[in-house]
A protein has these predicted regions:
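Auxiliary Fe-S-binding modules of radical SAM enzymes
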Residues: 1-136, 302-305, 312-387
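N-terminal pre-triad scaffold of radical SAM enzymes
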Residues: 115-131, 148-185, 338
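Non-heme iron-sulfur electron-transfer modules
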Residues: 134-160, 189-201, 205
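Fold-independent oxyanion-binding glycine-rich loops
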Residues: 147, 174, 186, 224-225, ...
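Short Fe-S-cluster ligation motifs
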Residues: 151-170, 206-224, 381-383
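Conserved AdoMet/S-adenosylmethionine-binding subsite of the radical SAM
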Residues: 201-359
Length: 387
């Protein structure tokens, strides 16, 4: 594996972290955090390989890029490989990273199968649960505004994420499958989603390697939302040979098929669970059947690996959204750490037309945030280390 930071670079990185986010160091003294994020921690510390790397070493017999294979054929190969991957990954972790250096990469791998399926899901597009059917490979954008091009607006070491994640090698992709009226990243998600830099998957891999070598604890795929970019992100893993945890930072409004493609590749999940009901989701983000889809996928993510769930407290929405969200988390994702976020501010359409959305036209009050904390405390949710 590539060495990360050396000498003065390591000292500078440590000093910066200590001065800017000392909690990013002290959080690992919390035994609950370390236990619940144990896989992520091991990959972050280079004690275990990231899942995507191991997926490149699991061979498959057929050429997944062959036009002779139907999607049904590919899914059969995928699901068989998924079962094999669990024991394959466990065996490699038991022997350590040096085991990988003794293996030869196969002609075609489990990762290749995922890549092939992902591109087929683009045309007509059914990657997210809008299932808009856009012919993206023909250059026709979906509801998310993304077509066949990989668009990145920025990438950097994010110092404002949850303590276990900082510094986070964050990549902001253009476009989003939500239409949130209060979006704080509305410029890249809705207004000018295609004005970023157009990259190839190879170039995206270079960005990830650069971020890791300069001290990133993880690669944080975000946006907008990264979901429309799944095919490009998966292909970038073919060219990425540095060990780094992959983090999925998303609204989770994706199909089961898309979730299956991600599940054996992502090391830590950072999903949003925004709303406690479908009415609020439709009125504020213009998505249907939100509750069933988001909770289904977050439950799958929880069962697949380490997870920190985010919930943004909206003004006037504690009873309709915050309470049911936290109650669901306590019942269904007991290992999750939860970031109860208090930084909502009116942006985008709400800021320009507060009369249209008076319920969310202000910041949350202190008593609303404190009520959210009391609800979480009563449910036994662990939120303080990451909120």
């Amino acid at each position: 594996m590539t060495k990360l930071l050396l000498g003065s670079e390591m000292v500078d990185w440590f000093i910066t972290l200590f001065n800017v986010r000392p909690d990013a160091l002290s959080v690992w003294l919390d035994p609950v955090v370390k236990e619940r994020l144990s896989h992520y921690y091991s990959v972050m510390k280079n004690e275990k390989p990231a899942r995507f790397i191991v997926a490149k070493y699991l061979p498959v017999d057929a050429n997944p890029y062959s036009s002779d294979l139907t999607q049904g054929d590919l899914w059969s190969i995928h699901d068989k490989s998924s079962e094999e991957f669990k024991s394959f990954y466990k065996d490699i972790c038991a022997e350590g990273l040096e085991k990988l250096s003794k293996l030869e990469k196969p002609s075609y791998s489990y990762l290749d199968v995922k890549i092939s399926i992902a591109y087929k899901l683009m045309n007509p597009c059914r990657i997210c649960e809008r299932k808009c059917g856009a012919l993206r490979l023909e250059g026709k954008p979906g509801v998310c505004s993304i077509d066949k091009e990989l668009i990145v607006h920025s990438y950097f070491h994010h110092m404002g994420e949850e303590a276990p994640l900082v510094p986070s090698g964050t990549i902001f992709y253009g476009g989003c499958n939500f239409k949130c009226v209060f979006c704080q990243n509305y410029d890249i998600s809705q207004v000018r989603p295609r004005d970023g830099e157009k990259l190839t998957p190879q170039e995206l891999a270079t960005v990830q390697a650069y971020l890791r070598r300069k001290g990133a604890r993880n690669i944080n795929h975000v946006g907008g939302d990264p979901t429309p970019h799944i095919p490009f992100i998966l292909e970038s893993f073919r060219y990425l040979d540095i060990n780094v945890p992959q983090l999925w930072n998303s609204n989770m409004y994706m199909t089961i098929e898309a979730m299956k493609l991600l599940e054996d590749l992502i090391d830590i999940w950072l999903p949003d669970l925004k709303y406690g009901n479908d009415n609020c989701a439709w009125r504020l983000s213009k998505v249907k059947n939100y509750w069933e889809i988001a909770t289904r996928n977050i439950k799958r993510a929880h069962d697949a690996g380490d997870i920190i769930i985010r919930h943004l407290v909206l003004p006037n929405h504690v009873e309709c959204c915050t309470r049911p969200v936290l109650e669901w988390i306590a019942r269904n994702t007991p290992r999750a750490l939860v970031n109860i976020m208090d930084q909502y501010r009116p942006e985008h359409i709400v800021a320009r037309h507060p009369e249209l959305y008076p319920d969310v036209a202000r910041r949350p009050k202190l008593d609303e945030i404190e009520l959210a904390y009391r609800i979480a405390d009563g449910l036994g949710i662990i939120y303080k280390p990451v909120s």
